[in-house]
């Protein structure tokens, strides 16, 4: 009997002993078996600590408004796995995802190439460049870290949940005859599964401290990992003014063309409802993004720079239409819960918390801001709380244990923070914390729910149900 999408997801979760295992060898080998080529005529890969999802959303919306056929791959999802794969403005259907998972599973367990589409060989150490190819230029399926043959090559390939999903998305894109595919990095960049694909343009939105167990505990180390998505002789768009020197050194070392916010392109305010984007050869006045945080202008500007770097003609009207229409769930998303305003945001590190704090200051309410906060155990929760200290009056700490070993209880969370947050009430889950905050909210108050994608997902399930 054929598996449903949920049965496939349950199966995939059990196929690798670790939820995260960085490295490209397994994914490359499976891609070779699937005969995966370049997933679209043009590819943009987007990495960074914060702003990846928003930047992808802006790129997709602008390209769609220009009439391009676009596919996007993002993670994690909030309510449905289908959110991760979008094709021509819609989420992939259950049936499409099931077909893709079936193809990946067949390839994973078969040593022979079985996929359809353009077959490409994964170039390994000692291979000669393709005809007409510069010696340092990678193939569509990447050679960024010359991979030795896998131990036991030809046998079943163990894939993590993310690797399996990445291959499924690439398989779907290859079937869809797309003009542009936009890939969001899952973790880091250099060893992330999406990095088997060579982009025409790479983007690094921001670099800040997060995922220290995997990427390092300072911006230079983390920047080095993220810079691994850059390619020789290709544009690397940098969405912040003070990128770590490790990013710039890597770009210089491989011959990537760094396109930097603040020097190669800028954004500047025009009036309360408009702003201007410009580079050396192009200038356009645009409406404020529908995504409302101040940082979204930088994300939108970075998206425009990425599309400009593709060197394809786009009508000016598409930029304005895309900026004005791009949306993304879980980013300062507003709800009304029985008369109380509720804002949900996936921010989960100090940099994101600083941006969130700036937005709260810019959008004051007459009453209090009550915060429902739950976070994964490996996050800098004290740094997050410190960034919001002046904007939140009451804290409702929630346990986040349904996600397994990465979660933590409200008591554990309270032990890692100080001040008003440490003295906040503690609750069994996000639902209980949100209900408690709603019970204490007065007419002029608002509730902020934040701390992780899991926190927001639990809140959205409640808010969409109207409970």
Give residue ranges: language-model regions:
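ATP-dependent carboxylate-amine ligase catalytic core
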Residues: 4-8, 18-41, 64-113, 124-140, ...
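Acidic, Mg2+-coordinating active-site environments of NTP-dependent enzymes
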Residues: 110-111, 135, 140, 154, ...
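C-terminal helical cap/extension that packs against the catalytic core
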Residues: 237, 241-259, 270-274, 308, ...
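Beta-strand->loop->alpha-helix junctions that form or flank phosphate-binding loops
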Residues: 73-76, 238-240, 252-270, 289-293, ...
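Active-site-proximal loop/hinge segments that shape catalytic or ion-binding/gating pockets
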Residues: 452
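Hydrophobic anchor at the beta1->P-loop junction of P-loop NTPases
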Residues: 44-46
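Nucleotide phosphate-binding/pyrophosphate-handling subdomain across enzymes
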Residues: 42, 180-185, 192-203, 207-211, ...
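Hydrophobic positions on the alpha1 helix immediately C-terminal to the Walker A/P-loop
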Residues: 54-58
